[in-house]
């Protein structure tokens, strides 16, 4: 056990060292010095990571140990690239402190994760508050529409703000809706698994079971219509369909979900101008008409592609590229910043780290026996995998841009805090999945066996007494001679409660 813990803390310290080296290299090349405020905050962040690891070892000792080091490297790399753009902005007279703010958000996320580890010993507690989670999730999702606090940024009304500070409540809404989806599908899995008629070789669900998926589909479209947020609406719908498949095991739900998705996507591209503009930029990225558009064109996308090409195989090196040429290179397009300064090799490492987190969550979902935990783990990990796929796919022209950001890397405190909580929830569920089953001791087995034997003996005596109650006096005398307890009965006799007397346990029955 000690060797295992040394290996785990060694992995965490190595990931922290990699993050610090990346920071130091970037500052040395881009600024020529390492600012003291960044150094102090980095030390605090490292201490919080170690403290979180200690809490996990105490309260969740069997949890997955590959998730936390992966988050350390991803978040460190993201903050390094964000700070790189801050340094360039300072040189041109437009100073920003997005990287420093992101470090503060990371510290806050680690504190909240530590509290979650201490307070939430058993994830099954979340099932008791399924409908409360639904209400909280919907309130968070619709809160940007409230007058006075709602903010529209980049054409999407998904922010709430107080003064100069903004928050994206939809990032937290996905967690609460995942709790509700998991509890609802676990309670209704039998009804949803019942099949109807076959179509194209698949047994389709009954018509009356279409209600949940239609409701979630309509809510997703409402998010798209009201908030102009394509990525969030797709994420909620995809999360529900994936959890529905896990709950029922029927591929027909995947087919039905895909049909609903295609219908919604085509209708949205024809009705909503901002969705149609993204589709046009995806289909014709290099056309002069699309590239020259002031808003909604392909200029950002094309610059990101050239940034990836400039990185080559090994990249220009941290602090030596020009990622600021691509708009939003510190948030939506931070993946292109990685490709430019670390090259294809760096991109593959980043994808491998995400794969480690996703694989850990999938293994947890397969291993855990509790149905609610299986659904919750699969829903959370699919949400993260879907985000990574849509961001990478949008930048590389596989799919249109959706507006989602890379977890742990992109600028944005709401996303960072929510995804850190998501990762800790996966660790808590994995602790339950990996915890060894308690062994039955010999004393416990002896107690249960003797209790069963005593119950059988008592029932036999009762039956014999009933059968002999109507016999003559000779039979009664004979029964009286043989009904008394024998020496063997006295040795194995148990009290009425079925417990073994203490003297027998200690003295071997003497």
Please give the residue ranges for each predicted region.
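Loop-to-helix entry and N-terminal half of a specific, functionally important transmembrane alpha helix
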Residues: 362-403, 409
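Long, low-complexity, intrinsically disordered segments
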Residues: 467-510
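Short, highly charged, low-complexity non-transmembrane loops/tails of multi-pass membrane proteins
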Residues: 436-484
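Hydrophobic alpha-helical transmembrane segments
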Residues: 43-51, 104-112, 341-361
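Hydrophobic alpha-helical segments of polytopic membrane proteins
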Residues: 210-270, 282-283
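Membrane-helix boundary/helix-loop-helix interface segments in multi-pass membrane proteins
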Residues: 2-44, 50-227, 392-407, 411-420, ...
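Interfacial segments of multi-pass membrane proteins
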Residues: 234-253, 321-346, 403-417
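Hydrophobic, glycine- and aromatic-enriched re-entrant/interface helices and adjoining loop segments
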Residues: 151-159, 163-166, 253-350, 369-376
């Amino acid at each position: 056990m000690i060797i295992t813990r040394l290996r785990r803390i060694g992995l965490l310290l190595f990931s922290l060292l990699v993050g610090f080296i990346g920071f130091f290299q970037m500052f040395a090349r881009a600024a020529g010095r390492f600012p003291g405020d960044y150094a102090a905050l980095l030390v605090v962040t490292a201490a919080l990571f170690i403290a979180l690891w200690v809490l996990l070892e105490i309260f969740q000792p069997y949890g997955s140990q590959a998730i936390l080091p992966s988050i350390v490297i991803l978040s460190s790399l993201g903050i390094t690239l964000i700070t790189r753009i801050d340094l360039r902005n300072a040189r041109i007279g437009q100073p920003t402190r997005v990287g420093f703010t992101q470090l503060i958000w990371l510290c806050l996320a680690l504190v909240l994760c530590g509290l979650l580890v201490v307070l939430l010993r058993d994830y099954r507690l979340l099932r008791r508050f399924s409908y409360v989670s639904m209400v909280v999730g919907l309130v968070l999702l619709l809160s940007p529409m409230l007058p006075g606090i709602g903010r529209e940024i980049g054409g999407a009304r998904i922010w709430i703000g107080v003064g100069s500070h903004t928050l994206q409540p939809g990032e937290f809404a996905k967690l609460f809706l995942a709790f509700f989806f998991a509890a609802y599908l676990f309670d209704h899995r039998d009804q949803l698994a019942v099949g109807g008629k076959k179509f194209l070789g698949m047994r389709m669900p009954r018509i009356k079971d279409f209600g949940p998926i239609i409701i979630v589909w309509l809510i997703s479209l409402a998010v798209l219509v009201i908030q102009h947020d394509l990525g969030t609406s797709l994420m909620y719908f995809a999360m529900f369909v994936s959890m529905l498949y896990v709950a029922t095991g029927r591929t027909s739900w995947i087919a039905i979900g895909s049909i609903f998705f295609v219908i919604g996507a085509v209708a949205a591209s024809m009705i909503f101008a901002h969705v149609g503009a993204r589709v046009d930029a995806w289909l014709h990225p290099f056309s002069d008409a699309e590239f020259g558009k002031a808003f909604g064109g392909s200029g950002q996308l094309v610059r990101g592609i050239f940034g990836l090409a400039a990185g080559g195989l090994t990249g220009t090196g941290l602090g030596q590229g020009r990622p600021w040429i691509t708009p939003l290179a510190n948030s939506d397009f931070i993946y292109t910043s990685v490709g430019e300064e670390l090259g294809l090799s760096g991109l593959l490492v980043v994808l491998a780290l995400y794969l480690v987190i996703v694989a850990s969550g999938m293994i947890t979902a397969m291993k855990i026996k509790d149905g609610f935990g299986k659904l919750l783990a699969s829903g959370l990990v699919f949400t993260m995998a879907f985000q990574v796929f849509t961001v990478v796919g949008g930048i590389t022209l596989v799919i249109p841009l959706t507006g989602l950001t890379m977890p742990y890397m992109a600028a944005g405190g709401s996303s960072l805090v929510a995804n850190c909580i998501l990762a800790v929830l996966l660790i808590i569920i994995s602790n339950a999945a990996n915890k060894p089953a308690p062994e039955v001791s010999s004393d416990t087995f002896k107690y249960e066996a003797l209790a069963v034997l005593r119950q059988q003996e008592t029932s036999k005596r009762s039956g014999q007494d009933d059968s002999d109650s109507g016999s003559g006096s000779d039979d009664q005398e004979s029964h009286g001679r043989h009904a008394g307890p024998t020496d063997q009965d006295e040795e194995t006799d148990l009290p009425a409660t079925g417990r073994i007397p203490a003297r027998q346990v200690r003295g071997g029955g003497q």
